[in-house]
Amino acid sequence: MKNQNLLWAISGGRCEYEGCNTPLYMDILTKKKYNKAYIAHIVADSLDGPRGDPERSEKLANEISNLMLLCDPHHTLIDKDVANHPEDRLVEMKRKHEER
C-alpha cells in the first residue's frame, strides 16, 4: 500500500504513458471523483507475464521504480503490444512523466 500511495503522488494521479497524462482520479467533464488507475509492472511480477524475467520479476514486483500508473487503454496496450513497449521505453516514459 505504501508504494501505491507513493506512485499516486509521484505520478500526479495521471497516466504516465507518453502523450496521455489523463487524470485518473476524476472525470474531466463532471469532476466526479473516482479511481480509474491501473498499476502496471514494467518488468512483469511473474516470469510468464509481459516482460517477465527469470531473475528480476519476483525481486522487482513491488519496487516503485518498476511500477507505472496508467489508464485502462494504455495498461492494456503495453501488455498486449510488448514488442513496441520494451522495458527501456517504459522506464523512459516513467522518468519523463515523473520529472515534470
Task: Give the ranges of each region predicted by the language model.
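A boundary/linker detector
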Residues: 1-12, 24
